[in-house]
């Protein structure tokens, strides 16, 4: 999965964001195992997945804060 753009994330619904976070967490779990066993070739993907999760969580929090104002 390529790096997610913030514009794409903002277009998602809350359910889609939750699904994306779940998928990224699963991917991160698998990548960590690959790294531990020496099978991981693209080590930068770990960083991208971690930052994608943070990006989605940040935008979700901004959306929630915008609704309450």
UniProtKB/Swiss-Prot annotation:
GO terms for molecular function: structural constituent of ribosome. GO terms for cellular component: cytosolic large ribosomal subunit. InterPro entries: Ribosomal_protein_uL29, Ribosomal_uL29, Ribosomal_uL29_sf. SUPFAM superfamilies: Ribosomal protein L29 (L29p). PANTHER family: 60S RIBOSOMAL PROTEIN L35/50S RIBOSOMAL PROTEIN L29, LARGE RIBOSOMAL SUBUNIT PROTEIN UL29C. Belongs to the universal ribosomal protein uL29 family. This is Large ribosomal subunit protein uL29. The gene is rpmC.
């Amino acid at each position: 999965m390529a790096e997610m753009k913030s514009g794409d994330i903002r277009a998602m619904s809350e359910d889609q964001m939750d699904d994306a976070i779940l998928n990224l967490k699963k991917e991160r779990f698998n990548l960590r195992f690959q790294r531990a066993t020496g099978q991981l070739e693209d080590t930068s993907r770990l960083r991208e997945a971690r930052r994608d999760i943070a990006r989605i969580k940040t935008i979700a929090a901004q959306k929630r804060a915008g609704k309450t104002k």
